């Protein structure tokens, strides 16, 4: 906490008076914003006005909020702030993809903007690092430090929109889709991820359709069950294997919550969700001679026969020191054809931003690893918390 130092003219000891920290309005969803404004004696519509300025205009200066009287603007400046994390570095790919290294404290997470003809997708991080230790993912090699705050999650969207152009400034949405597929496991940070997604969906926030906000998870089953009671967004599951033997090796959380348990939880979520239109997205990274044989494809089809889904096959994106290779195009093609013969909608994801290490599985950031224990001790008997770590 910052401090105000008051020193009398005499030689008496310095008196330290704590200075109250300002509320960062990016940490508040609409209900919380209204409660904060009610505490200031203001009606709910005033909170809605401020939210529109923040998210529709990407405004972080109270003086620019011209439909709010000056007296109240000055009061807000004393008590609150609008502070999104800053961009430490920007890289632009030859295919138009942009990667931002976002400063969060003394560390960095990465956010990726992927423009296409009919959409613009933002890939957002939820944690500084990741504790799940998936073997094919660069983020996992960085270790884990902490969860991101609401303001650091929604702040990535705000910062990207500010750079690309706010809705009310350019006349169209700068971001049409958000995917929680950046650094970290979103379900291990529900406390902050859910309010951030609420702001993404809110008409006074970014106003995205619930079908255009996607959360990806590796399978934290208790948290997935909890998610379905908290919010309705599209779901993608990081499966990556047709059986427990392979998944235990490349996605270690499978030793805690195996595929059968994971898919049962997915089914429960689908039953609660409208955003998924009755099906989920299966993410399957293609690792050469690890999980990409035609036998693996037949096994995957049998595994998913009771799970309404579409399947995204993801050519693996290399990073230094990784023990894997990317499946050849011919192996991916054969794998895809087997799945389509079973009637599955199957898409081979186009790699974007790999020349700037912005493709799926390549995000790394700058992480001070706080926990060497991570999943190893958890597998020895500790429960994986569904609360903020």
UniProtKB/Swiss-Prot annotation:
Q: Which reaction does it catalyse?
A: adenosine(2503) in 23S rRNA + 2 reduced [2Fe-2S]-[ferredoxin] + 2 S-adenosyl-L-methionine = 2-methyladenosine(2503) in 23S rRNA + 5'-deoxyadenosine + L-methionine + 2 oxidized [2Fe-2S]-[ferredoxin] + S-adenosyl-L-homocysteine; adenosine(37) in tRNA + 2 reduced [2Fe-2S]-[ferredoxin] + 2 S-adenosyl-L-methionine = 2-methyladenosine(37) in tRNA + 5'-deoxyadenosine + L-methionine + 2 oxidized [2Fe-2S]-[ferredoxin] + S-adenosyl-L-homocysteine
Keywords on record: 4Fe-4S, Cytoplasm, Disulfide bond, Iron, Iron-sulfur, Metal-binding, Methyltransferase, rRNA processing, S-adenosyl-L-methionine, Transferase, tRNA processing
Q: Which GO terms describe its molecular function?
A: 4 iron, 4 sulfur cluster binding; metal ion binding; rRNA (adenine(2503)-C2-)-methyltransferase activity; rRNA binding; tRNA (adenine(37)-C2)-methyltransferase activity; tRNA binding
> What further note is attached to this protein's record?
Reaction proceeds by a ping-pong mechanism involving intermediate methylation of a conserved cysteine residue.
The protein here is known as Dual-specificity RNA methyltransferase RlmN
Name of the gene encoding the protein in the UniProt record: rlmN
Report the family membership. Answer: Belongs to the radical SAM superfamily. RlmN family.
* InterPro entries to which the protein is assigned, alphabetical: Aldolase_TIM, Methyltransferase_A, RlmN_N, RNA_MTrfase_RlmN, rRNA_lsu_MTrfase_RlmN/Cfr, rSAM
> What class does this enzyme belong to in the EC scheme?
transferase
Q: What is its EC number?
A: 2.1.1.192
Quote the record's binding site residues for S-adenosyl-L-methionine: 184-185, 216, 238-240, 317
- Which residues does [4Fe-4S] cluster bind? 130, 134, 137
Q: Ranges for the Radical SAM core domain?
A: 116-355
Task: State the protein's purpose.
Answer: Specifically methylates position 2 of adenine 2503 in 23S rRNA and position 2 of adenine 37 in tRNAs. m2A2503 modification seems to play a crucial role in the proofreading step occurring at the peptidyl transferase center and thus would serve to optimize ribosomal fidelity.
Q: Which GO terms describe its biological process?
A: rRNA base methylation; tRNA methylation
The organism is Erwinia tasmaniensis (strain DSM 17950 / CFBP 7177 / CIP 109463 / NCPPB 4357 / Et1/99)
């Amino acid at each position: 906490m910052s401090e105000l130092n008051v020193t009398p003219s005499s030689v008496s000891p310095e008196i330290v008076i704590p200075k109250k920290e300002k509320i960062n309005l990016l940490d508040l969803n609409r209900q919380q914003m209204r409660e904060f404004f009610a505490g200031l004696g203001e009606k709910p519509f005033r909170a809605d006005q401020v939210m529109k300025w923040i998210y529709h205009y990407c405004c972080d200066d109270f003086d620019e909020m011209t439909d709010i009287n000056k007296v109240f603007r000055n009061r807000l400046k004393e008590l609150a702030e609008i502070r999104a994390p800053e961009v430490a570095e920007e890289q632009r790919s030859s295919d138009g993809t942009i990667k931002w290294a976002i400063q969060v404290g003394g560390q960095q997470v990465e956010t990726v903007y992927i423009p296409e003809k009919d959409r613009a997708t933002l890939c957002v991080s939820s944690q500084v690092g990741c504790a799940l230790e998936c073997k094919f993912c660069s983020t996992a090699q960085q270790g884990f430090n902490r969860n991101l705050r609401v303001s650091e999650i929604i702040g990535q969207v705000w910062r990207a929109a500010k750079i690309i152009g706010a809705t009310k400034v350019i006349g169209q949405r700068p971001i049409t889709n958000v995917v929680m597929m950046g650094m970290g496991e979103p379900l291990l940070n529900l406390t902050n991820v859910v309010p951030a997604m609420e702001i993404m969906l809110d008409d006074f926030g970014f106003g995205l359709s619930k079908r255009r906000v996607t959360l990806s998870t590796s399978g934290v089953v208790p948290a997935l069950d909890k998610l379905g009671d908290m919010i309705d967004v599209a779901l993608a599951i990081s499966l990556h294997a047709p059986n427990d033997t392979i998944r235990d090796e490349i996605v270690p959380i499978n030793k805690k919550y195996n595929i059968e348990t994971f898919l049962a939880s997915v089914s429960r979520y689908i039953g609660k969700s409208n955003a998924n239109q009755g099906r989920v997205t299966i993410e399957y990274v293609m690792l050469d001679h690890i999980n990409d044989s035609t036998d693996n494809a037949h096994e995957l089809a049998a595994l998913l026969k009771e799970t309404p889904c579409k399947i995204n096959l993801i050519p693996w994106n290399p990073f230094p020191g990784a023990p894997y290779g990317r499946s050849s195009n011919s192996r991916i093609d054969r794998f895809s054809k087997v799945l389509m013969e079973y009637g599955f909608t199957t898409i081979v994801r186009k790699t974007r931003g790999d020349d700037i290490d912005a493709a799926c599985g390549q995000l790394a950031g700058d992480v001070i690893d706080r926990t060497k224990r991570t999943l190893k001790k958890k597998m020895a008997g500790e429960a994986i918390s569904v609360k903020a770590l």
